[in-house]
Amino acid sequence: MSSSLLAGGHMVSLTPCEESRMALHPTPSPGLPALCPYYTTESWGTQPLMAPTLRKGSSDRLQQAQQAEARAHCLLQGPGEQASGASQDLESCIDFSLEALNQMILEIDPTFQLLPSGTAGPQAESTNSIMSRNKKEEPEALDIKYIEVTSTRSRYLDGPQRCSSPCATPPFGSPRSGSLFLSRDIPRETRSSSNESLIFSGNQGRGPSPLTPSSLSNAIPCRESRTSGSPLATPPGWEKGLRAPQRGSRVSILSASPVSDVSYVFGSNQSLPHSSLSSYPSSSRSLGSPASSSSSLHSLDRGSQCGRPSDAQAPSNPILGMGQPQAVQSTPVAKEQASSCPASVTNSMADIPIVLINGSPEPQSPPAQRTPGHQDSVQSRVTSPSHLCQAIKSPSKTLPDVPLPASPDGPAKDMQPTMKFVMDTSKYWFKPSITREQAINLLRTEKPGAFVIRDSSSYRGSFGLALKVQETSASAPNRPGEDSSDLIRHFLIESSAKGVHLKGADEEPYFGSLSSFVCQHSIMALALPCKLTIPQKELGGAEPASDSPTHGQTSCLKISAGCHTLYLSSVSVETLSGALAVQKAISVTLERDVLPTPTVVHFKVTEQGITLTDVQRKVFFRRHYPLSALRFCGMDPEQRKWQKYCKPSRIFGFVAKSQTEPQENVCHLFAEYDAVQPASQVISLVTALLQDTERM
């Protein structure tokens, strides 16, 4: 039959024959009858047929076909219809049945093959057996190539080539109102989703079929496997008819590449748990055959559905269609559903395993496992979640700064700290304003692993780490002035654009913050002598309060303070002291033609005096002023400000004896460098120390 008839998708109605509208020339062959019924898009009619000379036996076969059609028509009619039909002319009111039409098409095209259907009823089975028996008895076929059907006439023609045979498939039971789907067996790439089938419908009074699909683009109900022997076995040509409409859908199940079926199955095996994959043992069939997609159809529950109607597509593989949870499935299976669509199809991140997003698999869901047949191939494509978990847990220099949370199965034996715990306890281990001596005093009575981090007084922007180590680890030479019995080690944590890094340890990675540094070293020691123990309370313990004046003086002397300031200049004030000396020194400095260039220094106050450390080593390295040489320390009485980076900064200074001229005093001027570290703290401490010295 012509491709235009099969691919057009026209609805041809079987109506009683009418008078011929156009007559053809009589056939020259005496073997053919004068009148032969044919069909057009308008109606059935009996027209003189123009055909080439047939082989011997052709007229007998045509007569037998007409007799068989008449017998089949009489069988399908009821008793009342047979009585009424006997009084009418057979040629004027022929009501062809579905089986008679199939037999007529078979007589016209011997290569036409009827597809087996177990749900067509006993009449269809008997008709199929009769037609197959007649086909065996008639080995010789008519030399008719195809039929050209137009709106006005129909004739037999000799075509240049033989067309493919159409396949008649009653889908899922008896067709509604005698309708018949004729699916053209042509390549899928050359077909259109809207022009794939021709439906012949008659006016027989047959009951509607509840399983007849309304459209090929809708979701197709699940079918049993072909090997199960079920009456709903999928015909060979039906799968091709199902695949073509999917190519025009919004989201295509299979891409156009030859290996798309393989990659899609691998994506499903990666995301689905092992319990779901075990119910589909045949998913690892031969993927090299052309029918690899159709061979992977598996048997599902009768109450489940293969696809969702809203998707407007019918997945050809149940595993591929299980990307979304479905309401008709059981609850455990619905919980185990995961996105199985590969990123190459959906261009999204749906196929990324959950372990890559949350850091660990979902609780109450086993990690995805691969089938033995796909193990080697999948390993080359993507790493399994179990391997990812092992890679995350193993220490490496390429690990992220923030360690991932522990497994939801339960906490580890050593209770590895988390980032939240480290940040919540930072008030105990981060003391930016304390000095080196204070850090030693805090850790003196603590256990090995206790630590404290402070701002470095020698390197701007860096941090000092004081760590209490074990006795076996205290083999390194001690620095000058350091007591070996204290077992306190000091390390410098450098800060740069890459992050924070332990100075002198090339094997140490860079961390994004101090919290990440502490959290990682509390899990692994790395370059440190021992692991860090995160404190959960104040280090050194709280000392009991006392009203004793001696104890008050001692505690006051032990207190020290420090901050970063801008060193402006040093001005000789002769014999002046107090606030007047600071006021005069500031006035002299601001009246200069060229203002001094400030430098950042660390201003530290202890019971021994004031120690200045040039952070940038521009003006001096370190200066120390004993407490006995100090005279005064305070702010500018006139509240003048120093313009620092377009922001005003308060000016203060202290007065001390000159180291070169014992009779003169020198005022050293400073400006606040950071609002977080105000100068009021060091000024108050110096004033308190001077008052205590005068009392003594």
UniProtKB/Swiss-Prot annotation:
Instruction: Extract one GO cellular component term from the record.
Output: cytosol
Indicate, by first and last residue, each region the UniProt record lists as having compositional bias (Polar residues). 192-203, 326-344, 372-397
User: Where in the numbering of this chain does the PTB domain appear?
Assistant: 563-690
SH2 domain location is 429-536
Q: Where is this region: Disordered?
A: 157-246, 271-344, 356-416
Q: Span of the secretion signal?
A: 1-14
Quick check: keyword DNA damage in the entry?
A: no
- Entry keywords, A to Z: Actin-binding, Cell junction, Cytoplasm, Cytoskeleton, Phosphoprotein, SH2 domain, Signal
Top-rank taxon of the source lineage equals Eukaryota
- Record bears the keyword Phosphoprotein: yes
Location within or outside the cell: Cell junction, Focal adhesion; Cytoplasm, Cytoskeleton
UniProt xrefs under SUPFAM superfamilies: PH domain-like, SH2 domain
Which is a GO BP term held by this UniProt record? protein localization
InterPro entries xrefs: PH-like_dom_sf, PTB, PTB/PI_dom, SH2, SH2_dom_sf, Tensin_PTB, Tensin_PTEN_phosphatase
Task performed by this protein: Promotes EGF-induced cell migration by displacing tensin TNS3 from the cytoplasmic tail of integrin ITGB1 which results in dissociation of TNS3 from focal adhesions, disassembly of actin stress fibers and initiation of cell migration. Suppresses ligand-induced degradation of EGFR by reducing EGFR ubiquitination in the presence of EGF. Increases MET protein stability by inhibiting MET endocytosis and subsequent lysosomal degradation which leads to increased cell survival, proliferation and migration.
What's the family? Answer: Belongs to the PTEN phosphatase protein family.
PANTHER family associated with the record: TENSIN (PTHR45734), TENSIN-4 (PTHR45734:SF6)
Q: How does it assemble?
A: Interacts (via SH2 domain) with Rho GTPase-activating protein DLC1 (via C-terminus); the interaction is independent of DLC1 tyrosine phosphorylation. Interacts with integrin ITGB1; the interaction displaces tensin TNS3 from the ITGB1 cytoplasmic tail and promotes ITGB1 stability. Interacts (via SH2 domain) with E3 ubiquitin-protein ligase CBL (phosphorylated on 'Tyr-780'); the interaction is enhanced in the presence of EGF and reduces interaction of CBL with EGFR.
Supply the name of the protein.
Tensin-4
